[in-house]
Regions:
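Short acidic, glycine/serine/threonine-rich helix-capping segments at coil-helix boundaries
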Residues: 17-89
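Intrinsically disordered, low-complexity Ser/Thr-rich linker and spacer segments
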Residues: 3-19, 86-96
Length: 96
């Protein structure tokens, strides 16, 4: 008897992006992503800061995973096209 407690595993959260920028990447695109993340921090959307450079490090990873979790997705550390579009929409909605 389970006493009303479900023993079924909770369904896995969906994945927002399977490919995109990830920890260890170092490109001008990562710099652009980080500028969006820092703007989001200024607006109170994201709580993590990071260095202003083109390297995807721990600070960027923390910010990406924080937002993925906040939006109901798996924290897989990947910021792809869907992540960037969603982040832009969040920023746009804050500044309207």
């Amino acid at each position: 008897k389970t006493l009303g407690i479900s023993t079924a595993a909770s369904p896995a959260k969906p994945i927002l992006d399977k490919s995109g920028y990830k920890k260890g990447d170092s490109t001008i695109g990562v710099l652009s992503l980080k500028e969006l993340l820092l703007t989001a921090k200024t607006l109170g959307i994201n709580k993590y800061g990071m260095d202003k450079n083109k390297s995807f490090g721990t600070g960027t990873l923390n910010a990406v995973n924080y937002l993925l979790d906040k939006w109901g997705y798996q924290k897989n550390g990947i910021a792809g096209e869907n992540f960037i579009k969603r982040l832009h929409t969040e920023i746009e909605n804050k500044v309207k």
